[in-house]
Every structure is written in C-alpha cells, then in structure tokens.
Regions:
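Non-heme Fe(II)/2-oxoglutarate
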Residues: 1-67, 71-73
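Catalytic core of non-heme Fe(II) oxygenases with the double-stranded beta-helix
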Residues: 52-163
Length: 163
C-alpha cells in the first residue's frame, strides 16, 4: 500500500459483513471533538476485533512506529448528510496520535464522494480504500440519491512531542 493510491482493501463479502454490523447496531450522531457543526451523519463504532491484527500488520508494514488502531468507524450518509472539510489530527496533549487514516467505501451512492484537498482521486468502488496523513484536509460529500457507507481506521503511533 502507498499513501494516496486507491487499493482493494475489503472483499465484497467483508463489506457486506461490515454493512450488516453497522445496520444492526445503534447509530450515534457524528461529532468532531464533541461538536456536530462540521458534520451531519450517523456513525457506528466497530468493536469486533477479529480483523484488527491483519489491519495493524498492514499499517506496521508501512511504518514500524504504528502501535495500535483506534476503534474503526462506520459512517452513514443519506441525501443532505455530509462531513465538511476537516483534518483527523487530534489534540497533541495525548500520548498517541493518529499517524495514518484509512477510508474504505462499503457502499456507494449517487454523487457521494470522499475527497482529499490537493489530490485528484477517482471515486472509490465498493471495498476500495485510500490511506492518507491525518493532517490532510478531506471531506465526504452528500449523496443525491441512496446511502453512502464508509469505513474508517486510524493507525496510532507515539506522540513524539510527549516523550
């Protein structure tokens, strides 16, 4: 895997399993640092860990400093729902920081897109993902029809400013 290059991350069956998990779980209102102004959508935290070792190993092959992954998030977007331009970096007073962000398309919807500022990306297909730096501005646009569902993982490393 390389940063900013789409790749096949999940099989169709794995996407369907994550979709079923998300649809059968209680959804929360999406918030950023406790606020909902930047986004309007629904989320589910993916707490099953059966695939986590595989995902962690994938990130560690990219950078050995990766120690763990945060609980992944399943995000749901229907017409009128979106996540405006933002970054995934969190306050640097924590012992660990988000080192990489992975976003995967579980279900596409008409005109809904994941966009990275300063990068021209193709529309991701079901199971495709992209890995980028959390400091990169990105957003999820609203579908005009249907429901877009995405899956996000944050790979964590030590915050070197807290050593």
């Amino acid at each position: 895997m390389k940063l900013y290059e789409p790749f096949q991350f999940l099989t169709e069956e794995e996407c369907d399993q994550l979709l079923e998990y998300g649809r059968s779980s209680h959804k929360q209102t999406g918030k950023t640092l406790g606020k909902s102004a930047l986004r309007k959508n629904r989320i589910v935290w993916y707490r099953e860990s059966k695939w986590w070792p595989k995902w962690l190993m994938m990130f560690q092959k990219m950078d050995e400093s990766i120690e763990w992954i945060q609980d992944p998030q399943i995000s749901f977007y229907i017409p009128g729902e979106r996540y405006d331009w933002h970054v995934d970096t969190t306050p640097n007073h924590r012992t660990h920081i988000r080192h990489f962000t992975l976003t995967c398309e579980l279900q596409t919807a008409k005109n809904a897109r994941f966009e990275l500022q300063n990068y021209s990306l193709p529309k991701l297909k079901k199971g495709q993902a992209i890995i980028f730096k959390p400091s990169d501005m990105h957003r999820a646009t609203s579908p005009t029809f249907g429901e877009r569902v995405s899956f996000t993982i944050w790979a964590m490393s030590k915050n070197l400013t807290k050593s």
